[in-house]
Amino acid sequence: MGMPQISIRFSELAKSVTDRAGSKTVGLILAATYKEKILKLAPGDKVPTGVDKNAVEMSLIGGEQKPKRTVIVFAGEGFTEIDAALETLESEQIDYLALSGTAEGVPQKVVDWVKEQRDQGKNVKAIMNYAADHEAIINYATEKTTVDSTEYTADQFCPRIAGLLAGTPITMLQLTLFFRKFKIAQE
């Protein structure tokens, strides 16, 4: 009599793993204003005029797969409205969060927000050019990254790393994909 119950339990666990194995959602905080507080774009969607096209497109490139979507919130020029942007993100299901740029005090606010979300059971992680002091903070510390002769600072490249991780299935080692996608130059 116990076997059907075990079989059902295995099916439930397998479905849970399958659900988690697919592509993920990127959260992107931009230092800009826009007519809407939040914008959701899937791979292939047109980036509206007035939105940082480069950051959004980099977040949607993905890895082995493309991310499910990118949820963009606007934090005002110079991140003056970062608190409101983070509050807007609270109701969204995001897996990897990135800033495009930074301002004084903003990285710590994002780190604190991510920790709060984790305490509430959400599985969000942040990719930042900021010292990682928590398992949910991924420190992208490469000062400059060059892609197709375009040079990016670490802050500018964090959306790309978020998209890469969001598009990497759990069956694949993320570091392996990273080295396949990028050439790392050391001085």
Describe each region flagged by the PLM.
Residues 29-98:
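An N-terminal, globular interaction/scaffold subdomain
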Residues 16, 49-51, 136, 145:
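Intrinsic disorder/low-complexity signature
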Residues 1-26:
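Short, intrinsically disordered N-terminal pre-domain segments
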Residues 29-32, 39, 84-187:
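A glycine- and small-residue-enriched flexible loop/hinge signal that marks low-structured segments
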Residues 3-10, 47-52, 75-78, 103-107:
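A short linear-motif detector with a strong N-terminal bias
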Residues 23, 45, 52, 67, ...:
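Generic cytosolic/nucleocytoplasmic N-terminal low-complexity/intrinsically disordered segments
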